[in-house]
Swiss-Prot record:
Residues 1-21 have a biased composition (Polar residues). The keyword Cytoplasm does not apply. Its main location: nucleus. PANTHER family: B3 DOMAIN PROTEIN (PTHR34269:SF11), TRANSCRIPTION FACTOR B3-DOMAIN FAMILY-RELATED (PTHR34269). This is B3 domain-containing protein At4g02870. One of its GO terms (molecular function) is DNA binding. Residues 205-300 bind DNA. The keyword Nucleotide-binding does not apply. GO terms for cellular component: nucleus. Transmembrane segments: none annotated. Residues 1-39 are annotated as: Disordered. It is found in: Nucleus. InterPro entries: B3_DNA-bd, B3_domain, DNA-bd_pseudobarrel_sf.
């Protein structure tokens, strides 16, 4: 059916309004008698003069909108009326802009109603703006936007789909609790032997770190292999790891009236670490590597010997 030709009802004047309405209903339900040739002529007329058929606004007559049903269904007749409805409400829908098959924006308004004022005065139902926002949904190209009433909506939700999902994302953001990444500091070794250096320990002529027999037997001697303990009188080589500097040194563990570390103690530790009298050091036996670990626990801030000459 073309946009300019409307089927003419019977020319006989109806005697009453009821008979006129029945004839119009019968006319609407009857199939179109237009031929293919007439339809093609209508298309050609539109193609040659499209401005005759275009307007800035489209008048749509429809009943009260349903929140979950499509708002606009059917087709416009020759007068551009959206079917025959009871008690129609006239809405003005401006043209829809499309981007890759999704609606970009829809403006709907009714005379005398201002959305901002309506929401500001909605003291009876505080959830009204939220319900309307939840009712909006995108159904793709060719569909309208559902709403509960004739409000002016200017919402751009792009191609996100249902606007309810956008609100769900916002709610999830509020639930996120930032947990700081735990930082594990370097655990200080549990020194099993602690000693404050004496003047004898730092003298170059002695060149030995003296260890008490009880401390040596409990924390070092019982962990050494038997073949090394047999040679302890003449001395056995052991690795000593400096925990503070991360360096590995080889010293000689020996027994000469007292247990002690020699052959490298003066050069690799006293001089290199600038040790002085009353500095506190720590030692422990590392089972995993079969070696000693060394560390400086505290420094003597007062006067004390660093190096003496005989």
């Amino acid at each position: 059916m073309t946009l300019s030709d409307d089927p003419i009802s019977p020319s006989t004047q109806e005697s009453s309004n009821s008979s006129y309405v029945r004839s119009k209903e019968a006319e609407k339900n009857s199939p179109s008698q237009e031929t293919d040739e007439e339809v093609l002529k209508g298309y050609e007329s539109y193609r040659e003069n499209p401005s005759n058929y275009d307007n800035d606004n489209i008048l749509i007559y429809t009943d009260t909108f349903n929140l979950y049903d499509d708002m606009f269904e059917g087709s416009l007749d020759s007068t551009r009326n959206f079917g025959a409805q009871k008690d129609p409400n006239v809405l003005v829908m401006q043209r829809l802009l499309h981007n890759s098959g999704s609606l970009i924006g829809v403006d709907m308004e009714q005379d005398g109603i201002d959305l901002a004022t309506l929401f500001a005065d909605s003291t009876e139902d505080s959830k009204l703006p939220y319900v309307i926002y939840e009712g909006l949904e995108m159904q793709g190209e060719g569909y309208g936007t559902n709403t509960r009433g004739p409000f002016e909506n200017k919402i751009d939700i792009g191609s996100f789909g249902k606007s309810g999902s956008v609100m769900n994302v916002e709610r999830e953001k509020e639930k996120i609790v930032m947990i700081p990444t735990p930082r594990f500091g370097n655990a200080t070794p549990q020194w099993t032997i602690k000693k404050k250096l004496s003047s004898y320990d730092i003298r170059p002529r002695c060149g030995r770190l003296i260890l008490q027999s009880s401390s040596f037997n409990e924390h070092i001697g019982r962990h050494l292999p038997k073949d090394q303990m047999i040679k302890i009188n003449v001395g056995v080589n052991v690795n000593v790891y400096d925990y503070d500097t991360g360096t590995l040194h080889e010293l000689r563990l020996e027994y000469q009236r007292q247990y002690g570390l020699a052959h490298g103690w003066q050069e690799d530790f006293v001089r290199r670490r600038h040790l002085k009298q009353k500095d506190e050091i720590g030692l422990l036996w590392d089972f995993s590597s079969s070696r000693l670990q060394f560390g400086v626990i505290s420094r003597n801030t007062g006067p004390g010997l660093w190096e003496t000459k005989d």
